[in-house]
Amino acid sequence: MDVKRDDALGWRVFLKGGTEPTERSALDWLHELNHLGAGEILLTSMDRDGTGDGFDLQLLELASRLPIPLIASGGAGLEIHFLEALEHGADAVLAATLFHEGILPIPRLKAYLAQNDLSVRI
């Protein structure tokens, strides 16, 4: 689910790779997906995507109130960002830019998470 902060809706849902805004609130859509039986949600903060500024922790905290497992996406730049996302409700974390650009080696991230008592597949 691609979402972007919005003054009226909190977070607005976008379609088609984030190019088409909807009138749906992300939290309303999460509730509907829960009702429909979704198994997990890939939740991407478009505002944070590619910034390296960290995941949208407020969004994760709100979304994690539902029983659907969440994969946090958008904003990772440092090892601690992954830990913060997991501490704020994400069940899994996803990143692309910092791996593709060689900013953070995956083995280093896995070691960091393991040192912080998080289960990782090494």
Regions found by a protein language model. Name each.
Residues 83-122:
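C-terminal helical cap(s) of enzyme catalytic domains, especially alpha/beta-barrels
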Residues 7, 51, 103:
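Glycine/Thr-rich phosphate-binding loops of Rossmann-like dinucleotide-binding domains
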Residues 31-34, 60-65, 110-114:
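Surface-exposed amphipathic alpha-helices with a cationic face
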Residues 47, 76-80, 104:
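Short beta->alpha linker loops
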Residues 1-43, 47-48, 117:
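Conserved anion-binding
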Residues 20, 52, 76-79, 98:
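Gly/Ser/Thr-rich beta-alpha loop segments that engage phosphate groups in nucleotides
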Residues 22-27, 53-62:
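Charged helix-capping and loop-helix junction motifs
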Residues 57-95:
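Catalytic cores of alpha/beta
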